Swiss-Prot record:
Tissue occurrence: Expressed in stalks.
Record field: transmembrane: 7-23
Lumenal side: 24-396
CDD domains reported for this sequence: GT29
Protein name, per record: Sialyltransferase-like protein 2
Superkingdom in the source lineage: Eukaryota
Residue intervals on the Cytoplasmic side: 1-6
PANTHER family for the chain: BETA-1,6-GALACTOSYLTRANSFERASE GALT29A (PTHR46779), SIALYLTRANSFERASE-LIKE PROTEIN 2 (PTHR46779:SF2)
Presence of keyword DNA-binding: no
Native source organism of the sequence: Oryza sativa subsp. japonica
Membrane topology listed for this record: Single-pass type II membrane protein
Length: 396
């Protein structure tokens, strides 16, 4: 090194030392980064988050079904033989062959009381209004926005917050558990898909504050009971117990209208249709954990996940959505009947043993485990600004 370059180099070195010293003092004064600033970074694997946030073919399909019903559905009712009841038909135009003109195809058929329903035109208008609200919610969520913001609104939907909540799953592991009194001691008890409690009280309790169902349950109730039972007999825990329902098929919104039309003051039909944002949030969480489990178990790229799961039908379980709802309305959440063991029935109240392929139960178990042990690691809930995951306990 030539001597004439030495002084400038020393000057630069001195400035670097002074700058480093100043930065250290500044860091001491400011302290470490706050948790709020660090929480702005999305939780979880970025690629899996991006893939999970894609609503996929299933969402597109249900939107297309709702739009087609809104535009083309017709409703007709006819008296039965002897005029004991009326037959209701929901129909859609359908081309039975490529060259044939479309003809009405029956989508749903119900037997209803003679005088319980409004005229066909008014009933169709009400059905279209329900479909319109359903489509609007889905389209708003499709345009982006923070779907996790729904977590701050859930308490308002139920009218209040609750201190302790029990979400009672339907797993056969509850049989012989003796958890009934422990479940009933909670302020809010959520049960799934109208599972029976009679005969199982010692293990599952009897108290029910909210019934959470998928719309297939309501459809079955309406098909069986609309003719004979007020409000379709779809509130087995009592008419005062509200039902929260997520929509599997848009046509099931007609069942809700029918059951509401046959309700009476002594047999009301309190129904809450889940917010489209809650549906989207649950779908993303379920898909994220399923993607993560697939990558971990197979070593394959996440893009290959569709080889194992058909996106058109993949869906979170009713229990998982009930758990997410409880997170938004409860200060403490306890889960019962969400595990499985060798030889245990799939449902404690039926003889079913096989799990449904459209759900990834193992991935959902991973989600519940994170809620209990690592709540800050749950993706997408971190997008709900101002929301903190309450303590969660798994009792299986």
């Amino acid at each position: 090194m030539k001597r004439r370059h030495l002084p400038p180099v020393l000057v630069l070195l001195l400035l670097s030392i002074l700058s480093l010293s100043f930065r250290r003092r500044l860091l001491v004064l400011q302290g470490p980064p706050s948790s709020s600033s660090s929480s702005r970074h999305p939780v979880g694997d970025p690629l899996l988050r991006r893939l999970a946030a894609d609503d996929g073919a299933g969402s597109s399909q249900i939107l297309a079904e709702a739009a087609a019903l809104f535009a083309n559905a017709s409703i007709s009712t006819f008296p039965s033989l002897g005029n004991h009841h009326r037959l209701l038909y929901l129909r859609m135009p359908y081309a039975f062959s490529p060259r044939a003109p479309p003809r009405p195809k029956t989508v749903a058929r119900l037997r209803v009381p003679v005088d319980a329903l409004p005229p066909d035109g008014k009933l169709l208008a009400s059905f279209r209004a329900s479909l319109g609200s359903f489509l609007a919610g889905r389209r708003r969520r499709g345009r982006g926005g923070n779907v996790a913001g729904v977590m701050r609104d859930l308490a308002g939907v139920l009218g209040r917050r609750y201190r302790t909540c029990a979400v009672v799953g339907n797993s056969g592991v509850l049989l012989g558990s003796g958890r009934g009194p422990q479940i009933d001691a909670h302020d809010l008890v959520i049960r799934l898909n109208n599972a029976r409690v009679a005969g199982f009280a010692a293990d599952v309790g009897v108290k029910t504050s909210l019934s959470f169902v998928n719309s297939n349950i309501l459809h079955i109730c309406a098909a069986r009971n609309a003719i004979t039972r007020a409000a379709c007999g779809c509130h087995p825990y009592g008419g005062e117990v509200p039902m929260a329902m997520y929509v599997c098929q848009p046509a099931h919104l007609l069942d809700a209208l029918i059951c509401n039309a046959t309700a009476t003051p002594s047999s009301p039909f309190p129904l809450l249709v889940t917010d489209a944002r809650l549906d989207a949030l649950c779908a993303r969480i379920a898909k994220y954990y399923s993607l993560r489990r697939f990558v971990s178990a197979t070593g394959e790229p996440a893009a290959n996940w569709t080889r194992r799961h058909d996106e058109r039908y993949f869906h979170y379980s009713s229990g998982m959505q009930a758990v997410v709802m409880a997170l938004g309305v409860c200060d403490e959440v306890s889960l019962f009947g969400f595990g499985k063991s060798p030889g245990a029935k799939h449902h404690y109240h039926t003889n079913q043993k096989k799990e449904l392929d459209l759900h990834d139960y193992e991935a959902e178990y991973d989600f519940y485990g994170d809620l209990q042990a690592r709540p800050a690691a749950v993706p997408f809930l971190d997008d709900a600004h101002g929301f903190t995951v309450p303590p969660v306990r798994l009792h299986w």
